[in-house]
């Protein structure tokens, strides 16, 4: 791998670690960086997910004392269903050709960018309509969201927070704890599936994982100084630019 390629993917992973520690959205950077350096789209998605796994594990551990299951569910049920969903999403990715995934990616990025842009309003809307005790629909929601996360990491955190709001989790810290737990669980399972399926590009993984961890530590410090609206607007801008680039490549 060329030194320039290492610099590009490590830089992307570092900033992905920062924004994942603050608000999520690291895939907006890691996926295009890997594709730009010549990694096929499916392998790029799998490798980027694997590189960000240490950050998910650290976040889950940091929030371990705030994890509370939604009404009608247990923490064990959330973990098991999340693992099944993550595995299903990862298997679906492995069954997707590079050509098909290249056509899907712009739409996934667009979806994730819109979620980021309207995330606060969506959470407020759902909080006013949230109900408690929907065990069956809670399980369906966890399965669907984790399936999405196993297939494509982008915007996963926003989708999870919205789901937990809808299930009656009004405390944002508790919702974040559940989000971090589910993100870690489904990503561990998804990465295991990617490894068995041979989807990970190993030369790119070590520098990206190290850079993402360093970015996570930096993000924890930056988060105390950077206004959340500035961060969110920046992520939306990056997502919009990335989405346009992928659409131009698809239809250009």
Give short role names for the model-derived ranges.
Residues 1-40, 127-176, 182-183, 206:
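Selected transmembrane alpha-helices and immediately adjacent juxtamembrane segments
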Residues 5, 39-54, 100-109, 147-155, ...:
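Structural signature of hydrophobic alpha-helical transmembrane segments
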Residues 6, 49, 105-109, 113, ...:
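Residues within membrane-spanning alpha-helices of integral membrane proteins
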Residues 47-100, 187-230, 234:
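Selective hydrophobic functional segments
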Residues 58-67, 107-131, 241-252:
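Transmembrane helix exit motif
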Residues 71-81, 105, 129-135, 176-182, ...:
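Cytoplasmic-side transmembrane-helix entry/capping segments in multi-pass membrane proteins
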Residues 88-89, 144-154, 190-198, 242-252:
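Hydrophobic alpha-helical transmembrane segments in multi-pass integral membrane proteins
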């Amino acid at each position: 791998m060329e030194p320039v390629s290492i610099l590009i993917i490590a830089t992307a992973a570092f900033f992905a670690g920062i924004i994942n520690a603050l608000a999520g959205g690291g895939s907006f950077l890691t996926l295009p960086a890997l594709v730009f350096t010549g990694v096929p789209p499916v392998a790029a998605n799998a490798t980027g997910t694997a590189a960000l796994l240490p950050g998910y594990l650290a976040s889950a551990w940091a929030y371990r004392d705030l994890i509370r299951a939604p009404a009608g569910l247990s923490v064990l049920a959330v973990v098991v269903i999340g693992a099944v969903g993550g595995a299903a999403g990862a298997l679906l990715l492995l069954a997707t050709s590079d050509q098909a995934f290249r056509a899907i990616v712009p739409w996934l990025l667009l979806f994730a960018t819109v979620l980021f842009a309207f995330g606060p309003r969506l959470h407020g809307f759902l909080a006013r309509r949230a109900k408690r005790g929907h065990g069956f629909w809670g399980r369906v929601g966890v399965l669907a969201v984790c399936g999405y996360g196993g297939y494509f990491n982008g915007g996963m955190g926003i989708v999870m927070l919205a789901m937990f709001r809808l299930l009656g989790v009004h405390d944002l810290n508790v919702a974040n704890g559940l989000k971090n737990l589910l993100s870690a669980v489904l990503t561990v399972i998804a990465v295991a599936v990617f490894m068995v399926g041979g989807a990970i590009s190993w030369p790119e993984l070590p520098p990206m994982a190290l850079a993402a961890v360093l970015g996570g530590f930096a993000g924890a410090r930056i988060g105390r100084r950077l206004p959340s609206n500035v961060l969110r607007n920046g992520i939306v801008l990056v997502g919009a630019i990335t989405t346009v680039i992928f659409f131009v490549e698809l239809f250009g």
